[in-house]
Amino acid sequence: MAEGVPASPSSGEGSRGPHSGVIQWLVDNFCICEECSVPRCLMYEIYVETCGQNTENQVNPATFGKLVRLVFPDLGTRRLGTRGSARYHYDGICIKKSSFFYAQYCYLIGEKRYHSGDAIAFEKSTNYNSIIQQEATCEDHSPMKTDPVGSPLSEFRRCPFLEQEQAKKYSCNMMAFLADEYCNYCRDILRNVEDLLTSFWKSLQQDTVMLMSLPDVCQLFKCYDVQLYKGIEDVLLHDFLEDVSIQYLKSVQLFSKKFKLWLLNALEGVPALLQISKLKEVTLFVKRLRRKTYLSNMAKTMRMVLKSKRRVSVLKSDLQAIINQGTLATSKKALASDRSGADELENNPEMKCLRNLISLLGTSTDLRVFLSCLSSHLQAFVFQTSRSKEEFTKLAASFQLRWNLLLTAVSKAMTLCHRDSFGSWHLFHLLLLEYMIHILQSCLEEEEEEEDMGTVKEMLPDDPTLGQPDQALFHSLNSSLSQACASPSMEPLGVMPTHMGQGRYPVGVSNMVLRILGFLVDTAMGNKLIQVLLEDETTESAVKLSLPMGQEALITLKDGQQFVIQISDVPQSSEDIYFRENNANV
């Protein structure tokens, strides 16, 4: 990528204005270069990451584009890329090789697969000088490698310019070492999430998978999935009003999509009913996170509007003028069509809610106050007045429709008469709409979860002890087992080997059924375990055991019978299971 003519603002006034820092940033990092192009959104993304958490002086994309035109007055625009993934590019500029952001730019070019004739690969390394020196040798290499499953490591990117800035303040070697260690730590977490999903589902035996595919079992595990996904949500984005970076929100969305992809790949080959059940829950999980990240992004922008007293004052006065001047008369008929009698527009719950929200403008900069006001109106006019799920759905749909009509009428009036505050209103409008959808949708999802829990409880038997394992009667002996087996009275009576390819195994004890559930490996000790389900058909009780290979476990039944389970570790996929019955008391 050849560097060209250095950039300079076309006007001296611009460099001394309120955006002088942005202009100087453009001059320091970009230059004029024919036959080169820079993606517009990528250029702005690097600028946003440079600002970090200091968003007070950060400019929006439209202002940033105007400043780019100010610094590069003869700049062209091109739309490059394949159909469906084309991006607008600034044509005629390039990033300087001396820029702190050069390595990061090259990496992002490869990661996002932007079209650029001079794009080079960026190796994930903290040696930034070697990155530039290896430019020629990296041209024919892919910037990242992904496996068919979609490894999360390809989406985990470094921030070399920030690392370089920290290296200038502190020890360079220590900073490079610490950055490498921490990034490896983050990658290990992502890798382990995928490995946990894959290892669990791929280790299940066929009869276990068939058991999990039964409708009532699917319903039971659905309750566990709900808890799992809610726990992940609390960790990733507990409150969407938290002030988090845009990059973090992108990472949350990316993780949820990757999680769904990993699960689908792990479920390949399992019965369709089980796949559908798991797909439904993980899809709801992705949608909830998408709603939260979208709300968080809008809340971040709206928070900047509320901090500007001038913009809030103009917005409030314009909204009051629209309502007081009767500009919303066109929506009266639509809003009052569902009312019995001659209810006035001003007495509608939607108008009351809007008036209360307008009155809060200028009195508080806390976004929670506005959203709490909307929530209280929903609680009063929808939640408290509904006595059934069907009635709630009807009231919620009616309120949402009328609310949308009202806000759309306000937007129309803003467009025609109050252009100065239209941008602020548009943000406020979108936030209110999306927040209402989030509340109503979350309520419906919680209602469905409660119904699922009720279905699971209905499937439980009337006798609370029925089907519950008696841990006192079913126990395994570890240290004392060798001593007990050494006793002369504990000679085994018989051995019955069986092949583990079947789902049910005769065990040499009447009315006893042994099922193989799967295999586990103790990574800490290196021991291999086998999970079995032992069922007593007479007492209708069962217990799940994790038995070590090559050792014995003593089982005592309710009727006093005792037998030892011994599992021998044999090659390939077969196991010899020996059951030795002993009626002696131990």
Curated annotation (Swiss-Prot):
It is found in: Nucleus. Residues 22-97 bind DNA. Its main location: nucleus. The keyword Protease does not apply. It holds the Pfam family BCD_RFX. GO terms for biological process: regulation of transcription by RNA polymerase II. Keywords: DNA-binding, Nucleus, Transcription, Transcription regulation. GO terms for cellular component: chromatin; nucleus. One of its GO terms (molecular function) is DNA-binding transcription factor activity, RNA polymerase II-specific. May be a transcription factor. Belongs to the RFX family. This is DNA-binding protein RFX8. The lineage of its organism: Eukaryota, Metazoa, Chordata, Craniata, Vertebrata. The gene is RFX8.
